[in-house]
Amino acid sequence: TLASGNSGALFASLEAGSTPESAAGTLYGSVDPNPGAAQMFGDASGSIEQLIIRASQETHHMYGVRAAGLSPKQWRCLLQALIWQESRFTIGARSPVGAFGLTQIMPGTAQDLGIYPAYYENPYIQVTGGARYLAQMLAMFDGNVIHGLAAYNAGPGNVQRYGGVPPFAETQHYVQVIPERYNLYLA
């Protein structure tokens, strides 16, 4: 499985899957359930599915994605699983610690990515920002998807400090749930 770290063979075998459940449109609604989303973003935001597909296509070339050996479909499914875990596909999601949007980017990270403050107003920037940041974490950890996810959640310094997934309950859960969701989407 993805969680085992031996992702090459798994990705090759799962990519052939074409069950109806793997279609992005069946996995989440195309309209944000947040009643304020329409006022905040209008119809320019497009569906969440379209945002994820477009962002994954535009970031698939990044070194971290290539280092992880992810095909375009695998990258989309990983990004989709991350967004499910981070926000349950809610555009205006805000965490108690200040992370915002579909990909729950902290303001400081958004600043580093050059998307602050625009990501507060544009869901596409939320998704591409999260995709770029995840690709950076994958690059930092030589394509190791589990370490990249742990770094996305707990920060790269913690992954380096512990030599892998930190012993934080939230991060331990995070690196289990996203691969499970990824495998569901890819199947």
Task: Spell out what each predicted region is.
Residues 143, 148-187:
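Catalytic and substrate-binding regions of cell-wall glycan-acting enzymes that process beta-1,4-linked
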Residues 30-89:
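Export/targeting segments at the very N-terminus of extracytoplasmic proteins
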Residues 34-43, 66-69, 91-96, 113-123, ...:
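Second-shell loop/turn segments in exported
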Residues 96-116, 129-135, 150, 154-157, ...:
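Substrate-binding/active-site groove segments that recognize
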Residues 1-42, 50:
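Proline-rich, low-complexity linker regions of envelope-associated factors in Gram-negative bacteria
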Residues 55-59, 109-113, 159, 185:
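A short secondary-structure junction motif
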Residues 50-57, 77-80, 128-135, 146, ...:
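Solvent-exposed, polar/charged alpha-helical surfaces in well-ordered, non-transmembrane soluble domains
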